Every structure is written in structure tokens, then in C-alpha cells.
Amino acid sequence: MSLKVGSKVFYPTHGAEWIKEKKEIEFKGEKKEYYQCELINSPLEISTPVDNIEELGIRPVLKSTEIKDKIKVLKKTPKDNPKNKDFNDLVSTFDELHENADLESKIKLIQYCNYVKEKREKDGRLIPVTIEKELDKAILDIVGELAVSAGVKLD
């Protein structure tokens, strides 16, 4: 993957970001090239070793038209049954989807969370905080990627 200063990327654990600069950092006596990245959804900046980009699952941000096309599925299918036997299995499914770090995984997270929320509401049960957090994170990741793709900053 060919990245440079100004590239728009998606970092699985942090979300969408811009590569602000490339710099050399000495760590434990070893000098390495790093990308300094500005996150869309946080005031923090992170440094990522250039050599580890692919290992970390960092990928280029999709084009905004592609993102909009892909999220249209949520209009037709806002929820989907995760078919898990228990809540721990569901959390494991969420972890697997986070590892993929692609847009389709974020959409699937939203569908699963919507399904669980609706089912629990019908059953008169509380909605676990985990479901709300997963839903918020997936939505924020999609909105962040769309904003970075379009060159817009979130306020």
C-alpha cells in the first residue's frame, strides 16, 4: 500500500484519520520512520510505524460515493439476527467484526445491535451497555470515514 502525507486512512482501533506528516523517531535506540496521524473523532494524534501499516490493518479510506452506496443496505435491512446462543458469543462476533475493520463489518455490527435492541425491547428486557457502545462506535466509524473521505472535519 502506497501512503504519503495527506493520505486518508482507516485505522481499525482508532477510526478514520489523515496522515499529517512522516517523521523519524528513535525508540529503544532504534530509529524508525513513522506516520503522524490526525484522528477525525479525537483531539489525539498517533504515531504509527511505516513498516507496520499492513500488520495493523490500516487501509485507505473508501470514496464517499462508495460509502454512501454501501450503507444504503441499512435502509432495506436495518437489523439482522446474529444467531448467537448467548451474549458471550455475540461479544466474540463483535470482536471478529472489529478485526475485519471494513465498512461491511461496521454495517453488520449496526444490524446486529439493532436486532438485539428490538428483541430486548419487545421482551421488556434492559439493553446492555455493550450493545449501545458497539452501535455508537460503528456509527461513529462510518461517519468518520465518510467525513475524512469528503475532506470534512467533525466539530
Name these PLM-found stretches.
Residues 1-56:
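A positional/architectural concept
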Residues 51-155:
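Charge/polar-rich, low-complexity and marginally structured segments
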